[in-house]
Amino acid sequence: MNETPKPNSFRSGPDEDGRFGIYGGRFVAETLMPLILDLQDEWNKAKTDPAFQAELQHLGAHYIGRPSPLYFAERLTAELGGAKIYFKREELNHTGSHKINNCIGQILLAKRMGKTRIIAETGAGQHGVASATVAARFGLPCVVYMGATDVERQAPNVFRMKLLGAEVKPVTAGSGTLKDAMNEALRDWVTNVEDTYYLIGTAAGPHPYPEMVRDFQSVIGAEAKEQMLAAEGRLPDLVVAAVGGGSNAIGIFHPFLDDPSVKIVGVEAGGKGLQGDEHCASITAGSPGVLHGNRTYLLQDGDGQIKEGHSISAGLDYPGIGPEHSWLSDIGRVDYVPIMDHEALEAFQTLTRLEGIIPALEAAHAIAEVIKRAPTMSKDEIILMNLSGRGDKDIFTVGKILGMGL
Protein backbone atom coordinates (compact mmCIF):
# COMPACT_ATOMS: atom_id res chain seq x y z
CA MET A 1 0.00 0.00 0.00
CA ASN A 2 1.30 3.47 -0.86
CA GLU A 3 2.18 5.54 2.20
CA THR A 4 0.26 8.65 1.21
CA PRO A 5 0.44 11.62 3.60
CA LYS A 6 -2.90 12.24 5.32
CA PRO A 7 -4.63 15.45 4.16
CA ASN A 8 -6.18 18.02 6.55
CA SER A 9 -9.59 17.07 5.22
CA PHE A 10 -10.71 13.89 3.48
CA ARG A 11 -13.47 15.87 1.78
CA SER A 12 -11.57 18.44 -0.26
CA GLY A 13 -10.97 16.38 -3.43
CA PRO A 14 -10.81 16.20 -6.33
CA ASP A 15 -8.26 18.82 -7.47
CA GLU A 16 -8.97 20.92 -10.59
CA ASP A 17 -7.78 18.08 -12.83
CA GLY A 18 -10.28 15.75 -11.22
CA ARG A 19 -7.69 13.76 -9.29
CA PHE A 20 -7.92 12.13 -5.88
CA GLY A 21 -4.21 11.57 -5.25
CA ILE A 22 -3.06 9.47 -8.23
CA TYR A 23 -6.62 8.39 -9.11
CA GLY A 24 -9.37 9.90 -11.24
CA GLY A 25 -8.55 12.34 -14.02
CA ARG A 26 -9.92 12.57 -17.55
CA PHE A 27 -8.77 9.92 -20.01
CA VAL A 28 -11.12 10.51 -22.94
CA ALA A 29 -11.11 10.71 -26.74
CA GLU A 30 -10.21 14.14 -28.13
CA THR A 31 -13.73 14.56 -29.53
CA LEU A 32 -15.14 14.34 -26.01
CA MET A 33 -12.75 16.79 -24.37
CA PRO A 34 -14.66 19.99 -25.28
CA LEU A 35 -17.89 18.39 -24.06
CA ILE A 36 -16.31 17.26 -20.78
CA LEU A 37 -14.92 20.76 -20.17
CA ASP A 38 -18.31 22.28 -21.00
CA LEU A 39 -19.97 19.87 -18.58
CA GLN A 40 -17.48 20.77 -15.87
CA ASP A 41 -18.10 24.46 -16.44
CA GLU A 42 -21.89 24.01 -16.19
CA TRP A 43 -21.50 21.83 -13.11
CA ASN A 44 -19.35 24.45 -11.37
CA LYS A 45 -22.02 27.09 -12.09
CA ALA A 46 -24.92 24.84 -11.04
CA LYS A 47 -23.25 23.98 -7.71
CA THR A 48 -23.42 27.61 -6.61
CA ASP A 49 -26.72 28.50 -8.33
CA PRO A 50 -29.51 28.84 -5.72
CA ALA A 51 -32.20 28.23 -8.39
CA PHE A 52 -30.59 24.91 -9.42
CA GLN A 53 -30.25 23.81 -5.79
CA ALA A 54 -33.85 24.84 -5.01
CA GLU A 55 -35.22 22.80 -7.92
CA LEU A 56 -33.08 19.83 -6.89
CA GLN A 57 -34.42 20.00 -3.32
CA HIS A 58 -38.01 20.46 -4.47
CA LEU A 59 -37.84 17.36 -6.70
CA GLY A 60 -36.05 15.49 -3.91
CA ALA A 61 -38.92 16.14 -1.52
CA HIS A 62 -41.90 15.84 -3.88
CA TYR A 63 -40.75 13.38 -6.55
CA ILE A 64 -38.16 11.13 -4.87
CA GLY A 65 -39.71 11.25 -1.39
CA ARG A 66 -36.74 12.60 0.60
CA PRO A 67 -35.64 12.49 3.31
CA SER A 68 -35.58 8.69 3.39
CA PRO A 69 -36.10 7.30 6.92
CA LEU A 70 -33.42 6.14 9.34
CA TYR A 71 -34.69 2.81 10.67
CA PHE A 72 -33.64 0.95 13.82
CA ALA A 73 -33.49 -2.76 12.94
CA GLU A 74 -34.73 -4.00 16.29
CA ARG A 75 -35.10 -7.72 15.58
CA LEU A 76 -31.82 -8.01 13.64
CA THR A 77 -30.05 -6.18 16.48
CA ALA A 78 -31.56 -8.55 19.07
CA GLU A 79 -30.74 -11.62 16.98
CA LEU A 80 -27.06 -10.64 16.61
CA GLY A 81 -26.75 -9.51 20.22
CA GLY A 82 -24.20 -6.74 19.70
CA ALA A 83 -24.21 -3.22 18.28
CA LYS A 84 -27.42 -1.35 17.52
CA ILE A 85 -28.12 -1.51 13.79
CA TYR A 86 -29.67 1.35 11.84
CA PHE A 87 -30.54 1.35 8.14
CA LYS A 88 -30.70 4.38 5.90
CA ARG A 89 -33.74 3.34 3.87
CA GLU A 90 -32.77 4.35 0.32
CA GLU A 91 -34.85 1.48 -1.05
CA LEU A 92 -37.96 3.50 -0.17
CA ASN A 93 -37.10 6.18 -2.74
CA HIS A 94 -39.13 6.49 -5.94
CA THR A 95 -37.87 3.71 -8.31
CA GLY A 96 -36.58 1.65 -5.38
CA SER A 97 -32.95 2.65 -4.90
CA HIS A 98 -30.45 5.46 -4.39
CA LYS A 99 -29.93 5.81 -8.16
CA ILE A 100 -32.71 8.40 -8.57
CA ASN A 101 -30.82 10.97 -6.42
CA ASN A 102 -28.11 11.24 -9.06
CA CYS A 103 -30.46 10.99 -12.07
CA ILE A 104 -32.58 13.95 -10.98
CA GLY A 105 -29.44 16.03 -10.46
CA GLN A 106 -27.93 15.12 -13.81
CA ILE A 107 -31.11 15.58 -15.86
CA LEU A 108 -31.43 19.11 -14.47
CA LEU A 109 -27.85 19.67 -15.65
CA ALA A 110 -28.62 18.17 -19.09
CA LYS A 111 -31.58 20.53 -19.50
CA ARG A 112 -29.45 23.44 -18.37
CA MET A 113 -26.95 22.54 -21.12
CA GLY A 114 -29.71 22.37 -23.76
CA LYS A 115 -29.25 18.64 -24.46
CA THR A 116 -32.21 16.87 -26.07
CA ARG A 117 -31.27 13.17 -25.83
CA ILE A 118 -30.27 11.07 -22.83
CA ILE A 119 -28.12 7.94 -22.90
CA ALA A 120 -27.25 5.75 -19.92
CA GLU A 121 -25.63 2.45 -19.05
CA THR A 122 -27.04 0.03 -16.53
CA GLY A 123 -26.08 -3.21 -14.79
CA ALA A 124 -28.81 -4.25 -12.37
CA GLY A 125 -31.22 -2.05 -14.29
CA GLN A 126 -31.82 0.27 -11.32
CA HIS A 127 -29.90 3.15 -12.91
CA GLY A 128 -31.56 2.40 -16.25
CA VAL A 129 -34.98 2.61 -14.62
CA ALA A 130 -34.06 5.81 -12.79
CA SER A 131 -32.69 7.35 -16.02
CA ALA A 132 -35.79 6.33 -17.99
CA THR A 133 -37.92 7.74 -15.17
CA VAL A 134 -36.34 11.20 -15.15
CA ALA A 135 -36.27 11.27 -18.97
CA ALA A 136 -40.04 10.59 -18.96
CA ARG A 137 -40.58 13.24 -16.28
CA PHE A 138 -38.75 15.86 -18.37
CA GLY A 139 -39.95 14.66 -21.78
CA LEU A 140 -36.60 13.60 -23.27
CA PRO A 141 -35.88 10.48 -25.36
CA CYS A 142 -33.68 7.96 -23.57
CA VAL A 143 -31.48 5.09 -24.78
CA VAL A 144 -30.20 2.63 -22.17
CA TYR A 145 -27.26 0.33 -22.91
CA MET A 146 -27.41 -2.91 -20.96
CA GLY A 147 -25.25 -6.03 -21.17
CA ALA A 148 -27.13 -8.95 -22.73
CA THR A 149 -26.37 -11.10 -19.66
CA ASP A 150 -27.95 -8.45 -17.44
CA VAL A 151 -30.98 -8.08 -19.75
CA GLU A 152 -31.60 -11.77 -19.09
CA ARG A 153 -31.18 -11.69 -15.29
CA GLN A 154 -33.00 -8.38 -14.72
CA ALA A 155 -36.16 -8.90 -16.79
CA PRO A 156 -38.50 -6.85 -14.53
CA ASN A 157 -36.29 -3.76 -14.85
CA VAL A 158 -36.00 -4.14 -18.64
CA PHE A 159 -39.79 -4.15 -18.86
CA ARG A 160 -40.00 -1.10 -16.58
CA MET A 161 -37.59 0.86 -18.78
CA LYS A 162 -39.60 0.03 -21.89
CA LEU A 163 -42.84 1.01 -20.14
CA LEU A 164 -41.23 4.34 -19.29
CA GLY A 165 -40.54 4.92 -22.98
CA ALA A 166 -36.82 4.18 -23.05
CA GLU A 167 -35.12 2.16 -25.77
CA VAL A 168 -33.09 -0.69 -24.23
CA LYS A 169 -30.10 -1.76 -26.34
CA PRO A 170 -28.64 -5.14 -25.29
CA VAL A 171 -24.83 -5.31 -25.59
CA THR A 172 -23.41 -8.71 -26.54
CA ALA A 173 -19.71 -7.73 -26.55
CA GLY A 174 -17.39 -9.12 -23.84
CA SER A 175 -19.30 -10.82 -21.04
CA GLY A 176 -22.40 -8.74 -21.76
CA THR A 177 -22.36 -6.91 -18.41
CA LEU A 178 -21.94 -3.37 -17.06
CA LYS A 179 -18.41 -2.75 -18.38
CA ASP A 180 -19.53 -3.60 -21.91
CA ALA A 181 -22.66 -1.46 -21.61
CA MET A 182 -20.50 1.48 -20.52
CA ASN A 183 -18.16 0.98 -23.50
CA GLU A 184 -21.13 1.12 -25.89
CA ALA A 185 -22.57 4.21 -24.21
CA LEU A 186 -19.21 5.99 -24.54
CA ARG A 187 -19.13 5.06 -28.26
CA ASP A 188 -22.62 6.52 -28.73
CA TRP A 189 -21.63 9.70 -26.89
CA VAL A 190 -18.53 10.28 -29.06
CA THR A 191 -20.67 10.14 -32.22
CA ASN A 192 -23.55 12.26 -30.88
CA VAL A 193 -21.81 14.92 -28.81
CA GLU A 194 -23.95 17.83 -30.00
CA ASP A 195 -27.38 16.82 -28.69
CA THR A 196 -26.65 13.94 -26.28
CA TYR A 197 -26.10 13.91 -22.54
CA TYR A 198 -24.48 10.79 -21.05
CA LEU A 199 -26.07 10.17 -17.66
CA ILE A 200 -23.45 8.04 -15.86
CA GLY A 201 -24.89 6.04 -12.99
CA THR A 202 -21.92 5.53 -10.72
CA ALA A 203 -19.12 7.56 -9.13
CA ALA A 204 -16.68 6.61 -11.90
CA GLY A 205 -15.95 7.83 -15.42
CA PRO A 206 -13.99 10.94 -16.44
CA HIS A 207 -13.96 14.07 -14.25
CA PRO A 208 -16.36 15.75 -13.35
CA TYR A 209 -18.59 12.63 -13.12
CA PRO A 210 -17.11 11.06 -9.93
CA GLU A 211 -17.40 14.38 -8.09
CA MET A 212 -20.83 15.18 -9.48
CA VAL A 213 -22.35 11.79 -8.69
CA ARG A 214 -20.84 11.91 -5.19
CA ASP A 215 -22.30 15.35 -4.54
CA PHE A 216 -25.77 14.31 -5.72
CA GLN A 217 -25.58 11.14 -3.57
CA SER A 218 -24.13 12.87 -0.48
CA VAL A 219 -27.68 13.81 0.49
CA ILE A 220 -27.80 10.23 1.89
CA GLY A 221 -25.00 10.76 4.41
CA ALA A 222 -25.99 14.34 5.21
CA GLU A 223 -29.55 13.26 6.12
CA ALA A 224 -28.33 10.18 8.00
CA LYS A 225 -25.96 12.28 10.09
CA GLU A 226 -28.76 14.62 11.13
CA GLN A 227 -31.19 11.74 11.74
CA MET A 228 -28.62 9.81 13.80
CA LEU A 229 -27.95 12.83 16.02
CA ALA A 230 -31.71 13.20 16.52
CA ALA A 231 -32.19 9.47 17.30
CA GLU A 232 -29.10 8.75 19.41
CA GLY A 233 -27.55 12.12 20.20
CA ARG A 234 -24.27 11.03 18.61
CA LEU A 235 -22.64 9.73 15.45
CA PRO A 236 -22.44 6.00 14.59
CA ASP A 237 -19.30 4.01 15.43
CA LEU A 238 -19.35 2.25 12.07
CA VAL A 239 -20.77 3.11 8.64
CA VAL A 240 -21.16 0.27 6.11
CA ALA A 241 -22.18 0.21 2.44
CA ALA A 242 -21.86 -2.10 -0.56
CA VAL A 243 -19.45 -0.96 -3.28
CA GLY A 244 -19.68 -1.70 -7.01
CA GLY A 245 -18.80 1.48 -8.87
CA GLY A 246 -19.42 3.05 -5.49
CA SER A 247 -22.08 5.77 -5.70
CA ASN A 248 -24.33 4.66 -2.82
CA ALA A 249 -21.23 4.11 -0.69
CA ILE A 250 -19.56 7.46 -1.38
CA GLY A 251 -22.96 9.09 -0.82
CA ILE A 252 -23.19 7.82 2.74
CA PHE A 253 -19.42 7.89 3.48
CA HIS A 254 -18.54 11.40 2.34
CA PRO A 255 -20.30 13.43 5.07
CA PHE A 256 -18.60 11.23 7.73
CA LEU A 257 -15.03 11.25 6.33
CA ASP A 258 -13.81 14.03 8.62
CA ASP A 259 -15.31 12.46 11.77
CA PRO A 260 -12.40 10.46 13.23
CA SER A 261 -14.63 8.53 15.66
CA VAL A 262 -16.53 6.96 12.74
CA LYS A 263 -15.02 3.80 11.22
CA ILE A 264 -16.03 3.26 7.58
CA VAL A 265 -16.23 -0.02 5.67
CA GLY A 266 -16.98 -0.61 1.98
CA VAL A 267 -18.13 -4.09 0.98
CA GLU A 268 -16.99 -5.48 -2.37
CA ALA A 269 -18.37 -8.44 -4.30
CA GLY A 270 -16.27 -11.48 -3.39
CA GLY A 271 -18.28 -13.60 -5.85
CA LYS A 272 -17.24 -17.25 -5.72
CA GLY A 273 -14.01 -16.45 -3.86
CA LEU A 274 -10.86 -14.40 -4.48
CA GLN A 275 -8.69 -17.36 -5.56
CA GLY A 276 -9.91 -17.36 -9.17
CA ASP A 277 -11.37 -14.60 -11.34
CA GLU A 278 -15.00 -15.04 -10.35
CA HIS A 279 -15.35 -11.96 -8.16
CA CYS A 280 -15.51 -8.17 -8.47
CA ALA A 281 -13.30 -7.10 -5.57
CA SER A 282 -11.31 -4.40 -7.39
CA ILE A 283 -9.60 -2.95 -4.31
CA THR A 284 -9.05 -6.21 -2.44
CA ALA A 285 -7.67 -8.09 -5.44
CA GLY A 286 -7.07 -5.54 -8.22
CA SER A 287 -4.40 -3.02 -9.20
CA PRO A 288 -4.42 0.58 -10.51
CA GLY A 289 -5.11 1.13 -14.22
CA VAL A 290 -7.26 3.19 -16.58
CA LEU A 291 -10.84 2.31 -17.59
CA HIS A 292 -13.82 4.40 -18.69
CA GLY A 293 -12.01 7.71 -18.48
CA ASN A 294 -10.39 7.47 -15.06
CA ARG A 295 -7.47 5.88 -13.22
CA THR A 296 -8.59 3.59 -10.42
CA TYR A 297 -8.26 0.05 -9.03
CA LEU A 298 -9.25 -2.50 -11.67
CA LEU A 299 -9.43 -6.24 -12.18
CA GLN A 300 -6.79 -6.71 -14.89
CA ASP A 301 -4.28 -9.27 -16.06
CA GLY A 302 -0.51 -8.78 -16.38
CA ASP A 303 -0.97 -7.10 -19.78
CA GLY A 304 -3.49 -4.61 -18.43
CA GLN A 305 -6.42 -6.37 -20.12
CA ILE A 306 -9.63 -5.98 -18.12
CA LYS A 307 -10.85 -9.25 -16.62
CA GLU A 308 -14.48 -10.32 -16.68
CA GLY A 309 -15.58 -10.26 -13.05
CA HIS A 310 -18.49 -12.08 -11.47
CA SER A 311 -21.04 -11.33 -8.78
CA ILE A 312 -24.46 -12.74 -7.94
CA SER A 313 -25.49 -9.09 -7.92
CA ALA A 314 -25.65 -7.40 -11.33
CA GLY A 315 -25.07 -3.98 -9.75
CA LEU A 316 -21.71 -5.01 -8.24
CA ASP A 317 -20.59 -6.83 -11.38
CA TYR A 318 -18.11 -4.14 -12.50
CA PRO A 319 -14.34 -4.69 -12.82
CA GLY A 320 -13.45 -1.25 -11.40
CA ILE A 321 -14.44 1.18 -8.66
CA GLY A 322 -14.88 4.96 -8.35
CA PRO A 323 -11.50 6.76 -8.06
CA GLU A 324 -12.32 8.39 -4.72
CA HIS A 325 -12.73 4.93 -3.17
CA SER A 326 -9.28 3.93 -4.49
CA TRP A 327 -7.78 7.00 -2.82
CA LEU A 328 -9.68 6.47 0.45
CA SER A 329 -8.40 2.89 0.54
CA ASP A 330 -4.77 3.88 -0.11
CA ILE A 331 -4.75 6.54 2.62
CA GLY A 332 -6.40 4.13 5.05
CA ARG A 333 -9.54 6.16 5.80
CA VAL A 334 -11.92 3.45 4.54
CA ASP A 335 -11.50 -0.33 4.78
CA TYR A 336 -12.71 -2.40 1.83
CA VAL A 337 -13.63 -6.04 2.42
CA PRO A 338 -15.10 -8.79 0.22
CA ILE A 339 -18.34 -10.69 0.82
CA MET A 340 -19.01 -13.91 -1.12
CA ASP A 341 -22.15 -14.71 -3.12
CA HIS A 342 -23.32 -17.31 -0.60
CA GLU A 343 -22.91 -14.90 2.33
CA ALA A 344 -24.94 -12.22 0.53
CA LEU A 345 -27.64 -14.76 -0.29
CA GLU A 346 -27.86 -15.81 3.35
CA ALA A 347 -28.01 -12.16 4.50
CA PHE A 348 -30.76 -11.49 1.93
CA GLN A 349 -32.90 -14.20 3.54
CA THR A 350 -32.01 -13.19 7.11
CA LEU A 351 -33.09 -9.58 6.65
CA THR A 352 -36.27 -10.57 4.83
CA ARG A 353 -37.33 -12.90 7.64
CA LEU A 354 -36.28 -10.77 10.59
CA GLU A 355 -37.28 -7.28 9.45
CA GLY A 356 -39.79 -7.82 6.64
CA ILE A 357 -37.55 -5.95 4.19
CA ILE A 358 -36.50 -7.62 0.93
CA PRO A 359 -33.13 -6.00 0.11
CA ALA A 360 -31.41 -5.77 -3.26
CA LEU A 361 -28.57 -8.30 -3.62
CA GLU A 362 -26.16 -5.34 -3.73
CA ALA A 363 -27.30 -4.17 -0.27
CA ALA A 364 -27.33 -7.80 0.95
CA HIS A 365 -23.51 -7.74 0.68
CA ALA A 366 -23.42 -4.88 3.19
CA ILE A 367 -25.92 -6.70 5.43
CA ALA A 368 -23.65 -9.78 5.43
CA GLU A 369 -20.77 -7.64 6.71
CA VAL A 370 -23.02 -6.08 9.38
CA ILE A 371 -24.04 -9.61 10.46
CA LYS A 372 -20.33 -10.45 10.89
CA ARG A 373 -19.39 -7.28 12.78
CA ALA A 374 -22.36 -6.51 15.03
CA PRO A 375 -21.79 -9.45 17.44
CA THR A 376 -18.15 -8.38 17.95
CA MET A 377 -19.23 -4.89 19.07
CA SER A 378 -20.75 -3.81 22.39
CA LYS A 379 -24.45 -3.10 22.85
CA ASP A 380 -23.88 0.62 23.24
CA GLU A 381 -22.10 0.88 19.88
CA ILE A 382 -23.96 1.86 16.71
CA ILE A 383 -23.76 0.63 13.11
CA LEU A 384 -25.25 2.67 10.27
CA MET A 385 -25.76 0.81 7.00
CA ASN A 386 -26.96 2.10 3.66
CA LEU A 387 -29.85 -0.07 2.49
CA SER A 388 -29.35 1.12 -1.06
CA GLY A 389 -32.07 -0.75 -2.94
CA ARG A 390 -35.05 -3.06 -2.70
CA GLY A 391 -34.90 -6.64 -3.88
CA ASP A 392 -37.99 -7.00 -6.08
CA LYS A 393 -35.66 -7.13 -9.11
CA ASP A 394 -33.68 -10.01 -7.57
CA ILE A 395 -36.43 -12.45 -6.63
CA PHE A 396 -35.97 -14.40 -9.89
CA THR A 397 -32.20 -14.77 -9.35
CA VAL A 398 -32.68 -15.81 -5.72
CA GLY A 399 -35.62 -18.08 -6.56
CA LYS A 400 -33.55 -19.90 -9.17
CA ILE A 401 -30.64 -20.48 -6.75
CA LEU A 402 -32.93 -21.62 -3.94
CA GLY A 403 -34.75 -23.96 -6.34
CA MET A 404 -38.08 -22.17 -6.04
CA GLY A 405 -39.60 -21.88 -9.50
CA LEU A 406 -41.33 -18.55 -10.13
From Swiss-Prot:
Keyword tags: Amino-acid biosynthesis, Aromatic amino acid biosynthesis, Lyase, Pyridoxal phosphate, Tryptophan biosynthesis
In-chain residues carrying the UniProt-annotated modification N6-(pyridoxal phosphate)lysine: K99
Pathway: Amino-acid biosynthesis; L-tryptophan biosynthesis; L-tryptophan from chorismate: step 5/5
Pfam families linked to this entry: PALP
Molecular-function GO terms, alphabetical: tryptophan synthase activity
Cofactor annotation: pyridoxal 5'-phosphate
Catalytic activity: (1S,2R)-1-C-(indol-3-yl)glycerol 3-phosphate + L-serine = D-glyceraldehyde 3-phosphate + L-tryptophan + H2O
GO cellular component, one term: cytoplasm
Entry EC no(s): 4.2.1.20
Annotated PANTHER family: TRYPTOPHAN SYNTHASE, TRYPTOPHAN SYNTHASE-RELATED
Family label: Belongs to the TrpB family.
Subunit structure: Tetramer of two alpha and two beta chains.
Role: The beta subunit is responsible for the synthesis of L-tryptophan from indole and L-serine.
Protein name, as recorded: Tryptophan synthase beta chain
Organism expressing this protein natively: Rhizobium etli (strain CIAT 652)
